[in-house]
Amino acid sequence: MSNSITLEERGESFQPRPITSFVRREGRMTPAQKKALEHLWPRYGIDLGTGPLNLAAIFNRQAERILEIGFGNGESLLQQARAAPERDFLGIEVYRPGIGHLLLRLKAEGLENIRVIHGDAWEVLQRALPNPSLDGVQIFFPDPWPKKRHHKRRLIQPSFVDLLERKIKPGGWFHLATDWQDYAEQIKAVLSQHAGFNQLTNEGQSTQRPRTKFEARGQQQGHGVWDLRFKRSVDS
C-alpha cells in the first residue's frame, strides 16, 4: 500500500502552468543515448507517481539536496557532483538527448549522487517534491524568450517563485544565471517583490557555479553573464 500524500491531502491544489517556457522539440538522439535511456534509466532516473518522492530513500541517505532545472547535457551537474560527493543532486530536463548524454557520463564516472527526472519543472515541483525538501535550486541560462511578445513564456514569473518558496527550506538558496540583461532585470524585479527571498550577492560571475562550454562560447561572442543569488527567508 502506498503511503504517499496527494496534493489534496496536503491542503494544496494543482495549479497548471499558464503557458510553457519551452518548446517540445528535440534534436536527434544518438544510438548510445537511446540505449542509455533504455538501460540506465532504472539506475539513475526517477519515475513519478501520484505523491511526493521519498528523497532519502531514493538516495539512500540524508544529505544536502540541490535541484537543477533545465540541466541541458548535464555538464554543470556533473562538475558539482564530482566536487561535492557529500551532496545529492536532482536534475529536471525535458529534452531526452541531454538526459541520455548525462546518463552515459554518470555510468562512465561512477557517480551515485545524481538522479534525473524527465518532465516539466512546474509539474514536477508541484506533484513530486515535498514541502520544503530542497537546500538549493539552480537554473542556469534558461530560455530568455527575447521577443517582448514572448516574455510571458519566461520561466521566472511570480507564480513560479511562489512555488519555489514552498520547496526550498528556510535559509536555503536560489541561484540563477543568464546572459540576457533584460531577463536579469526581470528576475530581479520579480524576486524583489517577493517576501520569501532576499538577494545575496553582486551580479558578477559566480565562483560557485561551474563555467560550461555554452557559457564560454557566449563570452567569446561578447555576451555578458548575470549571476543572481537569493536566500530563502527564514521568516516567511
UniProtKB/Swiss-Prot annotation:
It catalyses: guanosine(46) in tRNA + S-adenosyl-L-methionine = N(7)-methylguanosine(46) in tRNA + S-adenosyl-L-homocysteine. The keyword Phosphoprotein does not apply. Pathway: tRNA modification; N(7)-methylguanine-tRNA biosynthesis. The keyword Lipid metabolism does not apply. GO terms for cellular component: tRNA methyltransferase complex. One of its GO terms (molecular function) is tRNA (guanine(46)-N7)-methyltransferase activity. Keywords: Methyltransferase, S-adenosyl-L-methionine, Transferase, tRNA processing. The active site is at 143. Its EC number is 2.1.1.33. Substrate binds at residues 147, 179, 212-215. InterPro entries: SAM-dependent_MTases_sf (IPR029063), tRNA_(Gua-N-7)_MeTrfase_Trmb (IPR003358), tRNA_methyltr_TrmB_bact (IPR055361). S-adenosyl-L-methionine binds at residues 68, 93, 120, 143. Catalyzes the formation of N(7)-methylguanine at position 46 (m7G46) in tRNA. HAMAP family: tRNA_methyltr_TrmB. Belongs to the class I-like SAM-binding methyltransferase superfamily. TrmB family. This is tRNA (guanine-N(7)-)-methyltransferase. The gene is trmB.
